[in-house]
Swiss-Prot record:
This is Lipoyl synthase, mitochondrial. It is an enzyme of class 2 (transferase). [4Fe-4S] cluster 1 binds at C125, C130, C136, S375. One of its GO terms (cellular component) is mitochondrion. The keyword S-adenosyl-L-methionine applies. GO terms for molecular function: 4 iron, 4 sulfur cluster binding; iron ion binding; lipoate synthase activity. It catalyses: [[Fe-S] cluster scaffold protein carrying a second [4Fe-4S](2+) cluster] + N(6)-octanoyl-L-lysyl-[protein] + 2 oxidized [2Fe-2S]-[ferredoxin] + 2 S-adenosyl-L-methionine + 4 H(+) = [[Fe-S] cluster scaffold protein] + N(6)-[(R)-dihydrolipoyl]-L-lysyl-[protein] + 4 Fe(3+) + 2 hydrogen sulfide + 2 5'-deoxyadenosine + 2 L-methionine + 2 reduced [2Fe-2S]-[ferredoxin].
Amino acid sequence: MFQRWSFALCRPIVAAAQVSQQQVPPSEEPRNESGAANPPLVKEEFLRQFRERLANDKTGRNSLEGFLDLPENLPPTAASIGPLKRGKEPLPPWLKLKVPMGASRQPRFNKIRRNMREKRLATVCEEAKCPNIGECWGGGDEEGDGTATATIMVMGAHCTRGCRFCSVMTSRTPPPLDPEEPRKTADAVADMGVEYIVMTMVDRDDLADGGAAHVVRCVTAVKERNPGLLLEALVGDFHGDLKLVEMVAGSPLNVYAHNIECVERITPNVRDRRASYRQSLKVLEHVNNFTKGAMLTKSSIMLGLGEKEEEVRQTLRDLRTAGVSAVTLGQYLQPSRTRLKVSRYAHPKEFEMWEKEALDMGFLYCASGPMVRSSYRAGEYYIKNILKQRETVEAPSVSDGGNEPKDSE
C-alpha cells in the first residue's frame, strides 16, 4: 500500500518534467542578460504546489502517521489489513523494521552469537527466525542502556511436533540428548553476563518423560553457576502428564511459561494434533495450584491466524482463570512458504486495546504489540521487578523429594 502510494505521487513529478521539456524548447528557453538559461520555473512551481498540497492534506492518507492514527469512532479491529493473498499485500508500515546496525556497533549481539556458535547451542531466536533478535541480543547497543537477553533452546534443534506456524525443524527421531548440555548452557549464560534468561525447549515426544528431567538439570546447572540470574522456562506440555509438570515447576526457575498460542477454535489447524487448547490451560492451572501461586506463570497469544475479537477476549479470560499472571500478544508472521499464511495484520491500536483489557482482567503484566513475541525483552524488565518484590516475601517451598530428576529415556 505504502509503495503504491509513493509511486502514485511520483508520477505527476515525472509527467510535469516531461511537459515542461515539451512546452519550452531549448531555443525558446528564457535566458538572463548573460545568455545563460534561467532555472526551469515550470518544475519549481509544480514542486512548490505539490509540497503545499501535501502539507495541507487533511485526509490522513498521505503520511505515515495517517496509517497509524485511526479516525474517531472506528474500532481498532476494523483497521486490520486483510484478508490477505500471498504476494498481493506488502507489510504495513508498523511492521517495517529499522535497518540493523553494523557489526562494529553491536558488541553484545556479536558476543552472544559467537558464544552460541562456540558451544554449539541452539536459540529459538535463530531457529524460529524471530524479527526481534537484533533488539534482544543487542540489549540497547545503540543507546548503551538496556539488558541483552536471549532465549536458549535445549534438547537440540529438532522438534517431534509439527505446528503449522513454527519454523523449527521437525523430526520423528531427533538426535539423542547431549549429557553435557546443562554444563554448556550454564557456561554460555555466565559468559553472556545477562540478568534474565529464557530457556525454551523443543518437544521430545520420543522420550518417556518428554525431556522433563533434562530441563530440570539444565535449569539447576544454570542457577547454580549464576545464582543471581532470573530464569524463565518456556516449556511444552509434557504429554499433559502433570507429574512431569510438577517436576519442572519444582526446579529453581523463576517464571513458568507455556504458550497457548491461539484461540480455541483454530487450535487444531494451527498446532500439532498432540497439543490442545484445554491441555495447555490444564498445565498452566496445575502449576499455579502446585506452587500455591508462588510461581509466576506466563503465556502468549498470536493474532493474524483467523481469530475473532470475542475469541481473543475469551482466551484472555481462560488464561486468567487458570491463574496466569503475565501474557503477551503479537502479530503472527509467516516464517516460510510451507507455514500457515497470515490472515490479517492487526493494527497497533488493536494491540493497545488488548493490553488495556488484559490489565483490567487482573494480569500483572501484558506486553501487546505487532512485534512482541513470547520472550520479547521489553516484558522482562517489568517481570524482573515483580520477581524482586516477591523475593522480599518468603515463598513456600514447591520442591518435593519425589520430584528428583531421573534420566530421560
